[in-house]
């Protein structure tokens, strides 16, 4: 769940099963599994918002089924909320670095105008936030997404993540 949230928030696309690894972390009485991306060529590139949601890829169905069978819906939602809070704290804690990166992304032609327009329309549809209208680059999309996340992270319904296009 946390991996899916990070992909959506960071606009990290195409996270099919062959583009990430599962790292087991052994503790005294349990094993925690963390998912780490290993392929970043689709970050902030795609115009289809669903491509930033790894749980929608057919290749990932076995893991999604495992999560559904092992975790309660309440736990899944709690993990999503926790991950958003962690991301917000990281954004605020690294504000200067993030701003510098975003500024360079604004002027870099990472994706086509069509993909930027399509993605901003879909995010606007989800958020109803006017700041997502008329954006010109993926850097601007990411900046507005981070700002939205920071200003709304206590709102557990933000981005209505269960909505599918």
Predicted regions span which residues?
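C-terminal catalytic region of ATP-dependent kinase domains
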Residues: 27-165
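Active-site acidic catalytic loop and adjacent metal/ATP-binding pocket
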Residues: 1-42
């Amino acid at each position: 769940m946390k991996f899916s949230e990070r992909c959506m928030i960071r606009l990290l696309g195409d996270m099919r099963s062959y583009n990430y690894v599962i790292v087991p972390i052994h503790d005294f009485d349990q094993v925690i599994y963390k998912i780490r991306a290993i392929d970043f060529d689709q970050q902030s590139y795609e115009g289809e918002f669903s491509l930033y949601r790894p749980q929608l890829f057919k290749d990932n169905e076995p893991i999604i089924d495992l999560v559904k069978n092992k975790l309660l819906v309440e736990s899944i939602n709690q993990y999503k909320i926790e991950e958003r809070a962690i991301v917000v704290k990281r954004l605020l804690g690294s504000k200067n670095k993030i701003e510098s990166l975003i500024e360079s992304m604004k002027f870099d032609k990472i994706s086509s105008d069509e993909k930027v327009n399509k993605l901003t329309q879909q995010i606007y549809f989800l958020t109803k936030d006017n700041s997502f209208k008329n954006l010109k680059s993926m850097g601007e999309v990411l900046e507005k997404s981070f700002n939205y996340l920071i200003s709304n992270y206590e709102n557990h319904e933000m981005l209505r993540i269960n909505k599918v296009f």
